[in-house]
UniProtKB/Swiss-Prot annotation:
The keyword Flavoprotein applies. One of its GO terms (cellular component) is cytoplasm. It holds the Pfam family DHO_dh. It is a peripheral membrane protein. The active site is at 183 (nucleophile). InterPro entries: Aldolase_TIM, DHO_dehydrogenase, Dihydroorotate_DH_1_2, Dihydroorotate_DH_2, Dihydroorotate_DH_cat, Dihydroorotate_DH_CS. This is Dihydroorotate dehydrogenase (quinone). FMN binds at residues 67-71, 91, 147, 180, 225, 253, 276, 305, 326-327. GO terms for biological process: 'de novo' pyrimidine nucleobase biosynthetic process; 'de novo' UMP biosynthetic process. Its cofactor is FMN. Pathway: Pyrimidine metabolism; UMP biosynthesis via de novo pathway; orotate from (S)-dihydroorotate (quinone route): step 1/1. It is found in: Cell membrane.
Length: 349
């Protein structure tokens, strides 16, 4: 086992003594230093092997990094070397924005959960693309997803303008693009999951992607990331709409607004999206409903509350083709990646 993997449980108490967002930044900086000095390079050669196909893309294993951990695409290579079969970075907006006031990230250790109200803080599309272009991840055979969103000050009626700018900017540099319409931290964003609003947005993205595919002579798959706080009727409507506009995959799910599982715990009443263990069951229900409605051919990425290999396998059993990790990495460290890949492989999925 890598020294890096062994070190994380020892470092975690010190990290958890810090403000959650500060610890996040310190961890990424430390990971980058370890990568730069070669401490994690050999992990790329020993990436867990559990070959899978997702949206037509060949993966070494079906365990990915969820968007949000590396919003600016500044740590792609260092993160990829932890053993992921694919890496997704962002969410990026056309223009730089600071996000919501700090503090805006809170741990709930008893629930193995996190609440964030970051609000798409990022350096903007130009800086994001420059970072992606510097990365060697794709050249080394890694699969890269780029996640796009809208600026906070863009009226919801003009949201499509931001997504079209984002798609055009990231298209040449992505193996797939994710349309994030489910963050609870951008006002009214989740309204885009509604039937009419979603259809209008996807119609424009479909046409723009066709134009970009012709220009760049390559087809880039498109995924849509949805919330866990949807009724069965809403899930069914989304499941029916996505194929109509040529969407290749769905990511289920983003964070939840529900606090039922953490009521009474410190920070439970903080505004923002709840991630981690309490989201697992919510995500499973959405995945199962999507699979039932969309049939066996749909590409579904399961994310939310994976803190063990068993939970990764449960996502696959519910109907996901692949999984993504974020909060689980904070509580378990990078060893979780290989554990999840091994569990999925052992189950023969």
């Amino acid at each position: 086992m890598s020294i890096l993997f062994q070190a994380y449980p020892l470092a975690r108490p010190a990290l958890f003594a810090m403000d959650a967002e500060t610890a996040h930044e310190v961890t990424l900086a430390g990971l980058q230093r370890a990568y730069d000095c070669g401490a994690t390079r050999r992990l790329l050669r020993t990436r867990p092997q559990a070959p899978a196909t997702l949206m037509g893309l060949a993966l070494d294993n079906p365990v990915g990094l969820a968007a949000g951990l590396d919003k600016n695409g500044a740590y792609i290579d260092a993160l990829g070397n932890l053993g992921f079969g694919f890496v997704e970075v962002g969410t990026v907006t056309p223009r730089a924005q600071p996000g919501n006031p700090k503090p805006r990230m809170f741990r709930l250790p008893r629930a193995q959960a996190l609440i964030n109200r970051l609000g798409f803080n990022n350096q903007g599309l130009d800086a994001f693309i420059a970072n992606v272009q510097r990365s060697q991840w794709r050249a080394q055979g890694g699969v890269l997803g780029l996640n796009i969103g809208k600026n906070a000050d863009t009226p919801i009626e003009r949201a499509a303008d931001d997504y079209l700018l984002g798609l055009e900017g990231v298209y040449p540099h992505a193996d797939y693009v994710t349309v994030n319409i489910s963050s609870p931290n951008t006002q009214n964003l989740r309204a885009l999951q509604g039937g009419d609003e979603l259809s209008a947005l996807l119609a424009q993205l479909r046409d723009k992607r066709a134009e970009l595919a012709d220009r760049h002579q390559r087809h880039v798959p498109l995924a849509v990331k949805i919330a866990p706080d949807l009724s069965e009727a809403q899930i069914d409507a989304i499941a029916d709409i996505l194929p109509r506009y040529g969407v290749d995959g769905v990511i289920a799910t983003n964070t939840t607004l529900s606090r039922d599982a953490v009521a009474g715990q410190p920070h439970a009443n903080e505004a923002g999206g709840l991630s981690g263990a309490p989201v697992h069951a919510l995500s499973l229900a959405v995945i199962a409903r999507l699979r039932q409605r969309m049939g066996p051919g749909a590409a579904i990425i399961g994310v939310g509350g994976i803190l063990s290999g068993r939970q990764a396998r449960e996502k696959i059993d519910a109907g996901a083709n692949a999984v993504q990790l974020y909060t689980g990495l904070i509580y378990r460290g990078p060893a979780l990646v290989g554990e999840c890949a091994s569990a999925i492989k052992a189950a023969g999925k």
